[in-house]
UniProtKB/Swiss-Prot annotation:
Subcellular location: Cytoplasm
Keyword Nuclease: yes
Annotated organism of origin: Streptomyces coelicolor (strain ATCC BAA-471 / A3(2) / M145)
Free-text function comment from the UniProt entry: Bidirectionally degrades single-stranded DNA into large acid-insoluble oligonucleotides, which are then degraded further into small acid-soluble oligonucleotides.
HAMAP family in the cross-refs: Exonuc_7_S (MF_00337)
GO MF annotation: an example: exodeoxyribonuclease VII activity
Any Pfam family hit: Exonuc_VII_S
Gene: xseB
Reactions this protein catalyses: Exonucleolytic cleavage in either 5'- to 3'- or 3'- to 5'-direction to yield nucleoside 5'-phosphates
Listed EC numbers: 3.1.11.6
GO biological process: DNA catabolic process
Statement: the UniProt record of this protein carries the keyword Ubl conjugation: no
Subunit field text: Heterooligomer composed of large and small subunits.
Name this polypeptide is given: Exodeoxyribonuclease 7 small subunit
Length: 88
């Protein structure tokens, strides 16, 4: 019972960013609305933490892909595709 929230479950990892974000929004709404038992609130909070981690990982992955693409564009030796308007 020490690291239940640290790693998202395989089912959570299968979610796309938008799905995880939408479910997280719903979890927050339910927590803010109240009316749940302590156990239900704790379960919702744990699920929210898991979903937030999925979102963080998806965003980190997207950021890494963008950084890699921008690095390729910035490397003039890598992108020699004749876009400089070369010759007559």
């Amino acid at each position: 019972m020490t690291s239940e929230v640290e790693q998202p479950t395989a089912m959570s990892e299968a979610l796309g960013y938008e799905q995880a974000r939408d479910e997280l929004i719903e979890v927050v709404r339910r927590l803010e609305a109240g009316g749940t038992t302590l156990e239900e609130s704790l379960a919702l909070w744990e699920r929210g933490e898991e979903l937030a981690e999925v979102c963080r990982r998806r965003l980190d992955g997207a950021r890494a892909r963008l950084d890699a693409a921008l690095a390729e564009e910035a490397d003039p030796e890598d992108g020699a595709s004749g876009a400089d308007g070369g010759g007559a």
